[in-house]
């Protein structure tokens, strides 16, 4: 059974689809997608469940969420293995994701109290009380690169605030979504509070269009997110939270300090998860001159030595494959396009078996107008520059604004960088791909419109209600003109 609707597992009635393991192309999951009618059934179930769920004391909702966290901990190795099989990421990496699924729940609970509690103050003779109320039914769209903890980062805050959920995982990772839903089932979640619908584009469109949806929480590609944004132009009654990708710049100063540490930071920023993190460095700005040359020489050498292999291989690999053969082809096509524009490959990304692509580095300094696209994979573009001001100017030449970084030991350079860079997440001497659940996650421009994270997700899962309250009725000393009593 593929879908969880109104507390029951049901078979999909739409088109058949499969999940292929990206490292060997074996079928590891198969089912039928949800039809528009089944999506509407899921939304109706969530709508009905919302009436009771929002009335429950917070302590009851919290208890169910905490029970789910314990289930995740008990099944963490199984979760890690399923994610590794579906995404191809090394098992050491998917274990960290399984841990994050449970670990960030504590942050979400704290955020509920900090950001959606009640507050009272006096103003102009009125007692002003600020309360927060749930939006209603939330549609959660999960990404394939972190199919466990990223959807969880939307679902948990939504439930804590009193919302109900219809969850659509990525069509690339249906198994992970199904496993998570079974854990919610085991902790006794009331029927209809979460509903799972699987499928591809048609299922997603039906969910976003459903009349009973009050808000959409989306994590995924900019292209899909922008389609949703246009789709919502005629639906002003729905809240839309988008967290999309980035064309993220990483600037290396002449004052970078330790060479090995600098190169390691670059590799972690560009190639972890096979480049399939939205915060990965896409463009690397390196100064002209001997110090910059040293970085490139060391980086090329270290990149050639990156171990790329299947997720359970020994010794452990640093990188696995792309999520699909199509995704691998996209990276190779992007490389070919940059080469045709005048880019010079320092290391050429090459296709391997199934969806494997080796990491590539290409010098694009001589390309007058770089394509402003997110190449979601292990393809790093190098741009040489003179002067930090020029580097920041080049780094800001993008429609995205998710993450950016500077490697520099000079405090004044850092102050200039943070004052002038356009990005929502900025790092100094740290990898771009690190993120804290306590910090806002997102950026301006084409990278999204809100800042989802374990902590800040509370902001868009409940709306503020302001009430001006008096203990008794009071007749003012002066009545408004034209009124007599």
Curated annotation (Swiss-Prot):
Reaction(s) catalysed by this chain's protein: N-succinyl-L-glutamate 5-semialdehyde + NAD(+) + H2O = N-succinyl-L-glutamate + NADH + 2 H(+)
The EC number(s) this enzyme carries: 1.2.1.71
Pathway(s) this gene product operates in, as recorded in its UniProt entry: Amino-acid degradation; L-arginine degradation via AST pathway; L-glutamate and succinate from L-arginine: step 4/5
A Pfam family assignment: Aldedh
GO MF annotation, one: succinylglutamate-semialdehyde dehydrogenase activity
Biological-process GO terms, alphabetical: arginine catabolic process to glutamate; arginine catabolic process to succinate
Entries under InterPro entries matching the protein: Ald_DH/histidinol_DH, Ald_DH_C, Ald_DH_CS_CYS, Ald_DH_CS_GLU, Ald_DH_N, Aldehyde_DH_dom, SuccinylGlu_semiald_DH_AstD
Binding site for NAD(+): 220-225
Active site: 243, 278
Top class in the EC scheme: oxidoreductase
Keyword tags: Arginine metabolism, NAD, Oxidoreductase
PANTHER family: ALDEHYDE DEHYDROGENASE-RELATED (PTHR11699)
Annotated function: Catalyzes the NAD-dependent reduction of succinylglutamate semialdehyde into succinylglutamate.
Annotated family: Belongs to the aldehyde dehydrogenase family. AstD subfamily.
Name of the molecule in the record: N-succinylglutamate 5-semialdehyde dehydrogenase
Organism: Vibrio campbellii (strain ATCC BAA-1116)
Gene field: astD
């Amino acid at each position: 059974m593929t879908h969880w609707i109104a507390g029951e597992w049901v078979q999909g009635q739409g088109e058949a689809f499969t999940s292929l393991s990206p490292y060997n192309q074996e079928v590891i999951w198969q089912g039928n997608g949800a039809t528009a009618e089944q999506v509407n059934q899921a939304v109706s179930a969530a709508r009905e469940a919302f009436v009771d769920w929002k009335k429950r004391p917070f302590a009851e909702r919290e208890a169910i969420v905490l029970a789910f966290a314990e289930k995740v901990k008990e099944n963490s190795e199984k979760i890690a293995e399923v994610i590794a099989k579906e995404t191809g990421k090394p098992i050491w990496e998917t274990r960290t994701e399984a841990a994050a699924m449970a670990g960030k729940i504590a942050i979400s609970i704290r955020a509920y109290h900090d950001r959606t509690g009640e507050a009272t103050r006096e103003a102009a003779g009125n007692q002003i009380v600020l309360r927060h109320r749930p939006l209603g039914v939330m549609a959660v769209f999960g990404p394939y690169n972190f199919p466990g903890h990223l959807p969880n980062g939307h679902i948990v805050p939504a439930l804590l605030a009193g919302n109900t959920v219809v969850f659509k995982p990525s069509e690339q990772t249906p198994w992970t979504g199904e496993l998570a839903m079974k854990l919610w089932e085991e902790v006794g979640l009331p029927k209809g509070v979460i509903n799972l619908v699987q499928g591809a584009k048609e299922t997603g469109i039906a969910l976003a269009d459903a009349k009973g949806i009050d808000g959409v929480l989306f994590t995924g590609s900019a292209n899909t997110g922008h389609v949703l944004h246009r789709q919502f132009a005629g639906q002003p009654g729905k809240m839309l939270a988008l967290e999309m990708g980035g064309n993220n710049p990483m600037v290396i100063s002449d004052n970078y300090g330790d060479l090995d540490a600098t190169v390691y930071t670059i590799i972690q920023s560009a190639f972890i998860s096979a480049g399939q993190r939205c915060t990965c460095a896409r463009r690397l700005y390196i100064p002209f001159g001997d110090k910059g040359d040293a970085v490139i020489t060391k980086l090329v050498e270290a990149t050639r030595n990156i171990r790329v292999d299947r997720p359970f291989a020994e010794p452990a690999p640093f990188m696995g494959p792309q999520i699909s053969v199509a995704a691998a082809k996209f990276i190779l096509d992007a490389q070919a396009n940059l080469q045709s524009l005048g880019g010079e490959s320092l290391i050429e990304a090459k296709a391997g078996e199934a969806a494997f692509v080796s990491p590539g580095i290409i010098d694009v300094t001589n390309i007058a107008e770089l394509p402003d696209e997110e190449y979601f994979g292990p393809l790093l573009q190098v741009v040489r520059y003179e002067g930090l001001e020029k580097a920041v100017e080049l780094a800001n030449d993008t429609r995205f604004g998710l993450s950016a970084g500077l490697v520099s030991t000079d405090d004044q350079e850092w102050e200039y960088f943070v004052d002038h860079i356009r990005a929502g997440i900025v790092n100094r001497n740290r990898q771009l791909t690190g993120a804290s659940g306590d910090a806002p996650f997102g950026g301006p421009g084409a990278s999204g419109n809100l800042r989802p994270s374990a902590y800040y997700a509370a902001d868009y899962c409940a709306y503020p209600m302001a009430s001006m309250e008096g203990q008794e009725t009071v007749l003012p000393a002066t009545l408004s003109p034209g009124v007599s009593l």
